[in-house]
Structures are given as C-alpha cells and as structure tokens.
C-alpha cells in the first residue's frame, strides 16, 4: 500500500494519527489567515461546545487569531487533531462533522470584511463566484486551485497543496453557492493524492 493510500485509510476521527500524517508534510510556506482559523474555532464551539473549543485552542497555543495575520497551517491541524474525535461522535461520523464544519466556516467567512468584498465582486452570480474561487481561497490559506468548466453550470475545481479532506471543502462550497441562491447545488469531492483533491460542482 502506498504512503498516500495508507494516509487515506486512517479516519479523521482517529485524531493525532490522521492529522499527524499531514503535519509531517507542512512547510514554512503553508499558512492560513487568522480569519480562517478563528472561524474554525467558532465552528468547533458551534458543533461541539465551549470546552472543546478551549481544548482545541490550547493544542495549538493560540486562544485567539487576528484576521489578517498569517499563521502556520500546522496550528489548524493541531486544533483538528483534538476536536475531530469528539465531533465525529457527535455528528454520526468524521465526514459529516467535517462537512458541517466547512459549511460553518464558509458562512462565517461570508460575513467577514473579506467575505463581503467577495460578495460585491461576484455580484450575486454563482458563476462569478466559482470563477473567483481560487482568489477567494487565497484570502484564507495557501495552496493551488483552478477551475475548469465542463458545462454552463458545472465545473471541476482542483486543489493542490491542501491539507483538508474533501468533505470539509464540500461543505464550504455548498454553503457559498447556496448563499448566492443557487438551487440544487451538488458538490462531489475526491482525494486524488495525499494533498490533492478535485470537486465536481453543479447547480441549477
């Protein structure tokens, strides 16, 4: 079994082992904005409780993040290594918990100063939002992302150098499109390599 396949065989529910595999691949260039990490903490509290939020923050040594500061992506993974075992139990399984977390994080982002800027930029049009997904993600974290259209309202969104499982991004993408009143939104993600994934996105 390849190293990547072994990594995928470990569930996010398993905490340190799963996230530790990803932490071992982090470089100094892998960063996240404070606004993203603060939204993750809020989602941990919303999906779990205040005690879990505090334990997760303690795991990375940061009680609060400043919106436009850059932080090592490792802090994000450290938080999740603590939070995910409990969240997976509360929300059926790890994929459900991660989907809900991604949804919460996206909704919180859209209410931020950066998110409001994105909403002005895309003028309420789902297709404009999708075209600007690489830019939107860069406001929150590093990594390479691209969009390839396969039809008028369907595309393939590709991520490279991304440390989160597909279910997290599925929740984020659904939330952002539904917020723009897109109907029958469908997002199906697949892991294509250890730090790479792709998403088939469609709506009506």
Regions found by a protein language model. Give the residues of each.
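N-terminal low-complexity or simple alpha-helical regulatory segments
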Residues: 8-110
């Amino acid at each position: 079994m390849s190293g990547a396949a072994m990594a995928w065989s470990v569930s996010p529910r398993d905490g340190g082992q799963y996230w530790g595999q990803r932490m071992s691949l982090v470089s100094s260039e892998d960063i996240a904005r404070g606004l993203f990490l603060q939204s993750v903490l809020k989602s941990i509290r919303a999906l779990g409780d205040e005690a879990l939020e505090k334990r997760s923050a303690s795991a990375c040594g940061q009680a609060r993040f400043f919106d436009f500061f850059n932080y090592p992506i490792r802090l994000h993974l450290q938080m999740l290594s603590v939070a995910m075992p409990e969240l997976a139990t509360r929300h059926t399984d790890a994929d459900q918990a991660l989907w809900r977390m991604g949804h919460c994080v996206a909704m919180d982002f859209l209410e931020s100063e950066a998110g409001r800027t994105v909403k002005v930029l895309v003028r309420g049009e789902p297709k404009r939002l999708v075209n600007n997904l690489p830019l939107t993600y860069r406001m929150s974290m590093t990594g390479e992302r691209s969009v390839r259209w396969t039809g008028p309202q369907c595309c393939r969104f590709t991520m490279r150098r991304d440390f989160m499982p597909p279910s997290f991004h599925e929740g984020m993408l659904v939330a952002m499109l539904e917020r723009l009143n897109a109907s029958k939104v469908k997002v199906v993600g697949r892991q294509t390599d250890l730090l790479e994934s792709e998403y088939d996105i469609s709506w009506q």
